[in-house]
Amino acid sequence: TFSFFQSLIQMRCFFNNSNYGSYSQESIQKLNGEQVKEFAINLHKYILENKKSGQELKDGQKNTVDLGYYLVTETSSDSEGAAVASTPIIVSVPQVSGDSWNYDVTINPKDNTPILEKNIVKENQRVKTSSENIGDVVKYEVKASIPVYQKNAQNIMYKFTDTMSKGLTYDEKTGFKVTSGDKVFAKDTDYTVEVKKQGDGETVITINFVYENIKAYAETGITLNYQAALNKDAVISNKENLGNTNNIELDYTNNPHVKDSYKKLTDKVTTYTFGFGITKVDSEINSKLLQGAKFSVKDAGGKTVAKYTYDEKGQVVSLSGNGVTNSKGITTFLGLKEGKYLITEEVAPSGYSLLKNPIEVTITANKDESGNYTGAATIEVSNGNKAGQIINDISENDGNILFNVQIENHAGFSLPSTGGLGNTGFIKIAIILLSIVCVLAILGLGYTKFENSRKTKN
């Protein structure tokens, strides 16, 4: 919607007024292109401060007007993309068109559209999604343009609101780094940061800028860098769109001359993490669940990475040592990124032989056509160990969904390759048995000599 003004009779107080550029009716006829823009801004300021009204012209509407010069201002902007209203412009009727006059004038306001883009920074790449272990740090980058308003614009809002889901812990110690090119903005001078923990576990961070301090950097825009850690409250799933989101909103003034004229841009990134349970069963009767088996989970580099599990109450807790199968034959390992993992049975259930070789499983996260993770994933036994197989998922009471790796044990006794008796035990037993044989042999030899001696005497 536009308003346009013509009558100079209503604007006598505008001319020769130092508050509005000290223009005269004669001087405005000699203005060049840039000076005309400045004149339009000052004239608009006068109209606002003196509450002058103009004729309204809606988008696409055609009005008949007298010949002359008009100040055209955008009073609202419903443009797609949340555009900022264009600055006031001077329009003449008619306009020169080649060698003739054009009396059918079309006004095309030049709205500027702010840009907001949020990414995860991973290995020097900017991505919308990532796969992480619980405890890993997720680095964020937000880039946004800075809207440009006319010089007399006041009370400009430029504010970011970042919402982290409960599975993300904001790193307050590191905080925000706010830059524009080589310029580093100062907290509490150029912007303020307010952090609030919500009842549902979300963290809401508000970054409010002093527009006067950043407007000179409109050409390069603004960049926010900050980070969070994936925590034990993270959503763990292998289904689409179930992840740990971080949303960003940019609220900004759309038209500084219209009360409460604000627009909002949004963007988000998502981090996914996975987990699996181990169900320990008898090799002959799979319905027989085995308690007391102890397992470790390591990545392909041999590092122990599974550090969280469910306790008996269904709460996510830190895993101390190995995972131990409960009365249902299950132990869980939570918060794992995609990749290969080695499951090693450290202690077998009572009455069962120890699993000889580790079971390697590979978690593969699905991606869409753009290369972004979808949240869906698959798991497979990837080293051919037939003692392990993938069965139906485990659904936890908190909504998390885990893969399920069923591992069989054979009844019987086995000696572990490390720990327990082991080879040392065999050596000790062999030495003891050999000692007994030697003693018996000596006793036997002594007895024979005694008998022979007794017979000789007789």
Question: In which residue ranges do the predicted regions lie?
Answer:
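Solvent-exposed loop/turn and edge beta-strand elements of beta-rich ligand-binding domains
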Residues: 1-458
